[in-house]
């Protein structure tokens, strides 16, 4: 799904509003926004939309990254050739953020915060006073609480929300407009996967595929019958 066709789901709207607020904050206020929540809640989808909307730089962290690898990834996203030392690279990033006025979105930030590389984030913010959007797993707020210099620069905490029934209906209609999926079936899917957007997407595709195979134009819970709903658990072995 491209950023131009992203459905305006709950978390997409929440993050977009928070980025807008941070980008237009008074100069005396801090500029960090943190979205956090379980895997599969659509945080990266929200980040892609916000990056497109605000022309933000976007970096997705990796667990294996060192401070240097993290800074090089940011500079590559900015189209800047990295200098030799970490200090010089921090200055390069900060200067570009200040000069461009563009936010930077750092996804899977837990991989940086759980290491000494977290201090690099503080240095970048202090040197740029820019808008930094940090996105990560549920443990991110607790991890940041141990980093007072970073923690007290947060303007807004944005807990990612489980998908609502309205989200599921909107996603089904926009992704598979040729097949009408009833609210009772979509509600059952949502409840079974506890609002996990990634697993909802898997189930919508399975429903769509089954509808094509059976020439269904409409699918409700009764039609779906005893067919399985993917919850992430492997099926029980058959004896």
Regions found by a protein language model. Give the residues of each.
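Conserved catalytic segments around the Walker B and adjacent sensor/switch elements
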Residues: 51-63
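A short helix-turn-beta junction within AAA+ P-loop NTPase domains corresponding to the substrate/partner-engaging
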Residues: 56, 145-162
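Phosphate-binding P-loop
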Residues: 21-30, 97
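Walker A/P-loop nucleotide-binding motif
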Residues: 27-47
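Mid-core helix/loop region of P-loop NTP-binding domains shared across ATPases and GTPases
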Residues: 66, 72, 81-107, 111-127, ...
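Sensor-1/coupling segment of RecA-like P-loop NTPase cores
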Residues: 33-39, 124-148
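Class I S-adenosyl-L-methionine-dependent methyltransferase catalytic core
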Residues: 5-8, 75, 83
């Amino acid at each position: 799904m491209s950023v131009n066709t992203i459905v305006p789901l709950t978390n997409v709207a929440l993050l977009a509003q928070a980025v807008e607020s941070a980008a237009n904050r008074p100069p005396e206020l801090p500029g960090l926004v943190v979205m956090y929540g379980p895997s599969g809640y659509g945080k990266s989808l929200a980040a892609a939309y916000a990056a497109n909307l605000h022309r933000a730089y976007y970096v997705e962290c990796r667990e294996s990254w060192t401070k240097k690898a993290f800074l090089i990834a940011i500079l590559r996203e900015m189209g800047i050739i990295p200098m030799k030392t970490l200090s010089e690279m921090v200055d390069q990033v900060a200067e570009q953020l200040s000069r461009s006025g563009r936010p930077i979105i750092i996804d899977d930030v837990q991989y940086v915060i759980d290491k000494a590389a977290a201090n690099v984030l503080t240095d970048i913010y202090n040197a740029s006073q820019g808008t930094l959007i940090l996105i990560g797993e549920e443990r991110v707020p607790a991890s940041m609480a141990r980093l007072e210099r970073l923690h007290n620069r947060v303007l807004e905490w944005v807990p990612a929300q489980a998908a609502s029934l309205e989200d599921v209906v909107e996603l089904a209609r926009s992704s598979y407009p040729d097949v009408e999926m009833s609210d009772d079936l979509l509600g059952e899917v949502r409840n079974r996967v506890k609002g996990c957007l990634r697993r909802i997407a898997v189930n919508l595709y399975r429903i769509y595929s089954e509808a094509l195979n059976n020439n269904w134009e409409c699918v409700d819970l009764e039609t779906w019958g005893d067919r399985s709903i993917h919850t992430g658990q492997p099926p029980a072995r058959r004896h």
